[in-house]
Swiss-Prot record:
This is UPF0342 protein BCG9842_B4422. Belongs to the UPF0342 family. It comes from Bacillus cereus (strain G9842). Coiled coil: none annotated.
């Protein structure tokens, strides 16, 4: 009997929510949100990050001033232990999600690589 792919996706969603790295990420995010200075700095970082991504997607040039502002914010973030822990945990979870994505995409990869070899 074939499994419904959406049911499997919901199982995966639940597994991610129960993952220790995700639980730690939630705790780290709550700690950042509870500290006014950390929250403001994190919000500033996210705003800057989204602005730079938007510029790149629109084909606009990232200026030297943009780079300098980004470097200044990153330098301040590296001094904030709460944000640093949040970002490290997010990176670990991103690795897990990337691994899962590779597994999910394997049938397509095999299909297309078999087509190229034929």
């Amino acid at each position: 009997m074939t499994k419904n792919i959406h049911d499997v996706a919901y199982e995966l969603q639940k597994a991610i929510a129960e993952n220790e790295d995700f639980k730690t990420l939630k705790e780290s995010y709550a700690a950042v949100q509870a500290d006014a200075a950390s929250k403001n700095l994190f919000d500033e970082f996210r705003t800057m990050q989204l602005s730079l991504q938007q510029k790149m997607m629109q084909g606009q040039e990232i200026t030297e001033e943009d780079n300098q502002q980004a470097q200044e914010v990153v330098a301040r973030i590296q001094q904030d232990a709460k944000i640093t822990k949040l970002m490290e945990t997010e990176q670990r979870l991103n690795v897990v999600i990337g691994d899962v994505n590779k597994i999910i995409m394997k049938p397509l990869e095999e299909l297309y690589s078999a087509q190229q070899q034929a």
